[in-house]
């Protein structure tokens, strides 16, 4: 039996409709998800693995130093007045070395190496790195603070050691060129024969002090970042590859072979989250991301803020802060004794240095911190931590991880140089480590993910629309044709015109004479 043309068309339209639904809403998402699971894992064949090993572009590493304009007043107990100088822009190249895969537990181990190059063109107007900055002497104050906390009976000796090592300084401030304090280093003279400075310098040689590099002739070179520039970090990091489960990709499971830290208390020692260079795909607005920072010995848990856009791609913006350790039960285990004010994190146990981490300009911190220093202006847009993720692939498109480092001006009666200082926490510098994917990598993401996704989106709606309207049209045509056929078939109850029949006229004969009607007399 030969089908009518409209039924053939209806079959085609129905097929297009069903294929549009099945392919567009069922098959393609499953194919895309399966492909992403393969591509986002840290297997040796993927592009993600290559970028994870060596980021093919430089990150933006910006340093803002605080210049103290009234050191003489501060030395006498006055309120510090500071002026921000920066940014000093450095191109930061990140790579992972000594990489080993472990098939049995789907992990990979590595060490990291960061290299910095000063970029004067991208630095603040007129900044060359040769500007002289006046700031609290980090090394001097750190030495005094550590002894006051751990061996207070030795504070008399520390006063003599300071005078010997730093040549009888007039105050606790250092006047130093910006690039020297950041990377090149400033000299610490340990070629002393007096007992106090010699004892301190001997202790320095035995311990690995952050920022301190040994030089010939009993000299040390101290800088904020120089010791990590171009050197391999000694710590061995173990993370999940995500081949067996892509949602585990990049998760830190051990450092130096230890499944957790021994720095803090309770769950604060756990490694929670990724290593910060790769994140799982398929993010939703309800997901809480986590990443572990080795520099601060803790995990951060950014939360979703809003939708945003970057170079035509819809992203999810996540934000974070340092936290309130005293009032947040999850963070209380970071406190060794009384918790610091809101927005401050004591790094003594992590860095072995009496430093405090905070948001730049004390953003989201205890208001009292701002009252103790003049010259700070916190701004959430300039000083907040924010990361824009492409949610399907979990790719960070734009990121600004900002943190400020602070130190307490130690007031101590047993050291003449310290006995008049204001007992307050003051800022030293803050950094902004960020990235913004350039056009090349954004286009790569568009061609590999978004253009196929958009094409399928257009095709599926065309198929569904064509199929839907085709089915409706064929249905209407089919039933209209049936009605007309039924109306014209024999034996139907249809009403037809009947032509009246002509009647033949016939002669009628009358028998007898016609009579008139009888008259009635009234």
Swiss-Prot record:
Residues 1-11, 477-522 are cytoplasmic. One of its GO terms (biological process) is sensory perception of smell. Disulfide bonds join 268-333, 297-350, 335-339. The keyword Disulfide bond applies. Keywords: Cell membrane, Disulfide bond, Glycoprotein, Membrane, Olfaction, Receptor, Sensory transduction, Transmembrane, Transmembrane helix. Residues 33-455 are extracellular. It is a multi-pass membrane protein. Glycans are attached at residues 67, 229, 438. It holds the Pfam family CD36. The chain crosses the membrane at residues 12-32, 456-476. It is found in: Cell membrane. The keyword GTP-binding does not apply. PANTHER family: SCAVENGER RECEPTOR CLASS B TYPE-1 SR-B1, SENSORY NEURON MEMBRANE PROTEIN 1. Plays an olfactory role that is not restricted to pheromone sensitivity. Belongs to the CD36 family. This is Sensory neuron membrane protein 1. The gene is SNMP1.
């Amino acid at each position: 039996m030969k089908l009518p043309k409209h039924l053939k068309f209806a079959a085609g339209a129905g097929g297009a409709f069903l294929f549009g639904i099945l392919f567009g809403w069922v098959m393609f998402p499953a194919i895309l998800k399966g492909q992403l699971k393969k591509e986002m894992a840290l297997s040796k064949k993927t592009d993600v693995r290559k970028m994870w090993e060596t980021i093919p572009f430089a990150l933006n590493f910006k340093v803002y130093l605080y210049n103290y304009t009234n050191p003489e007043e501060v030395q006498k107990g006055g309120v510090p007045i500071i002026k921000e100088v920066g940014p000093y822009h450095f191109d930061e190249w990140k790579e992972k070395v000594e990489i080993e895969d472990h098939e049995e537990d789907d992990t990979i181990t590595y060490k990291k190496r960061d290299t910095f190059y000063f970029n004067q063109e991208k630095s603040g107007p007129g900044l060359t790195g040769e500007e002289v900055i006046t700031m609290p002497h980090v090394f001097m104050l750190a030495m005094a603070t550590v002894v006051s906390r751990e061996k207070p009976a030795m504070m008399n000796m520390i006063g003599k050691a300071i005078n010997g090592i730093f040549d009888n300084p007039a105050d606790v401030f250092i006047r130093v060129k910006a690039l020297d304090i950041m990377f090149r280093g400033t000299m610490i003279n340990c070629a002393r024969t007096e007992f106090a400075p010699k004892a301190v310098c001997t202790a320095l040689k035995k311990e690995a002090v952050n920022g301190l590099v040994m030089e010939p002739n009993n000299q040390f070179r101290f800088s904020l970042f120089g010791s990590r520039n171009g050197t391999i970090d000694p710590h061995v990091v173990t993370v999940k590859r995500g081949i067996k489960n892509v949602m585990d990709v990049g998760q830190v499971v051990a450092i130096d072979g230890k499944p957790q830290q021994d720095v803090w208390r309770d769950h604060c020692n756990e490694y929670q989250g990724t290593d910060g260079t790769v994140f799982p795909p398929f993010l939703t607005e309800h997901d809480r991301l986590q990443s572990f920072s080795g520099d601060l010995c803790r995990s951060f848990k950014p939360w979703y803020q809003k939708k945003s856009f970057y170079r035509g791609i819809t992203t999810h913006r996540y934000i974070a802060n340092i936290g309130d350790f005293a009032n947040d039960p999850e963070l209380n285990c970071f406190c060794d004794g009384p918790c610091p004010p809101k927005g401050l994190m004591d790094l003594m146990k992590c860095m072995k240095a009496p430093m405090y981490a905070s948001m730049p300009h004390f953003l989201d911190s205890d208001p009292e911190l701002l009252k103790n220093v003049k010259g700070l202006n916190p701004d959430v847009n300039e000083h907040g931590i924010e990361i824009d993720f492409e949610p399907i692939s979990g790719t960070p498109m734009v990121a600004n991880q900002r943190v400020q480092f602070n130190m307490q001006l130690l007031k101590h009666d047993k050291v003449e140089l310290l006995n008049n200082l204001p007992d307050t926490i003051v800022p030293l510098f803050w950094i902004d480590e960020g990235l913004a994917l350039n056009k090349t990598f954004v286009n790569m993401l568009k061609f590999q993910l978004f253009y196929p996704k958009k094409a399928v989106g257009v095709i599926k709606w065309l198929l569904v629309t064509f199929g839907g309207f085709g089915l409706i049209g064929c249905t209407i045509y089919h039933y209209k044709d049936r009605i007309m056929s039924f109306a014209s078939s024999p034996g139907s109850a249809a009403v037809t015109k009947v032509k009246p029949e002509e009647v033949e006229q016939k002669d009628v004969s009358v028998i007898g004479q016609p009579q008139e009607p009888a008259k009635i007399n009234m």
